[in-house]
């Protein structure tokens, strides 16, 4: 079942189709498409919903002020969640999105970005457990657009917030947590790993020099897998 159009916003659809027929709009009503998807979900053991952006929403000269999923897709996810079936969201997007609500609704999220011609096979391998996902996020996912810029290892200036020593006069959001929803380097697996015995070739880094780090990585789970350090 299709479930929803990428967006029901005619202005965005017109923009995406300005130079090419990039997005095809289903003429059925949003509720009709949702009803069809819910009927299929009720007959399923697990619901897999593919959501995200059209490719034209994330390329050059395609900035967005709202980085949540389009409302049409959010309505679909809410309806699928209401069925009570396990819900897996497959994300196709070209930028970090604000997914606070979806994080609460989904039992699992698989980030695929914009995959190539064999993307469908690769996604199926992960979903069916034939391949163990091992990727980590190359960028942080904010909780909302108001957190941008949020990135790993940024320079704390002024009076940065310390959660262990809260103070009224420190830099923080009072309506949201300070950290990102998914930080740089975040990623789950069907197994678990432990990292130990971290050693450095030198305690100092000379100008134009290098330092080599070594670690011991152990698969502590019951499935084969790989990870990124």
PLM region descriptions:
Residues 1-25, 92-226:
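Secreted, periplasmic, or luminal enzymes acting at the cell surface/secretory milieu
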Residues 9-104:
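Hydrophobic helix-and-loop "lid/oligomerization" segment in the mid-to-C-terminal part
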């Amino acid at each position: 079942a299709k479930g929803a159009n990428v967006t029901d916003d005619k202005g965005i659809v017109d923009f995406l189709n300005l130079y090419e027929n990039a997005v095809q709009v289903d003429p059925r009503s949003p509720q009709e498409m949702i009803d069809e998807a819910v009927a299929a979900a009720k007959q399923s053991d697990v619901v897999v919903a593919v959501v995200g952006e059209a490719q034209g929403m994330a390329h050059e000269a395609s900035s967005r002020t709202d980085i949540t999923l389009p409302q049409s897709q959010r309505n679909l996810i809410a309806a699928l969640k209401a069925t009570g079936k396990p819900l897996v969201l497959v994300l196709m997007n070209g930028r970090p999105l604000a997914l606070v609500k979806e994080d609460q609704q989904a039992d699992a999220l698989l980030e695929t970005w914009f995959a190539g011609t064999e993307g469908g096979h690769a996604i199926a391998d992960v979903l069916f457990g034939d391949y163990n996902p091992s990727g980590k996020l190359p960028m942080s996912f904010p909780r909302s657009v108001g957190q941008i810029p949020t990135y790993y290892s940024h320079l704390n200036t002024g009076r940065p917030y310390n959660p262990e020593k809260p103070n009224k006069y420190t830099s923080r959001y009072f309506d949201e947590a300070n950290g990102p929803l998914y930080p740089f380097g975040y990623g789950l697996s069907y197994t678990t790993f432990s990292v130990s015995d971290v050693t450095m070739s030198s305690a100092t880094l000379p100008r134009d020099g290098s330092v080599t780090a070594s670690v011991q990585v152990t698969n502590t789970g019951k499935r084969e897998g790989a990870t990124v350090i």
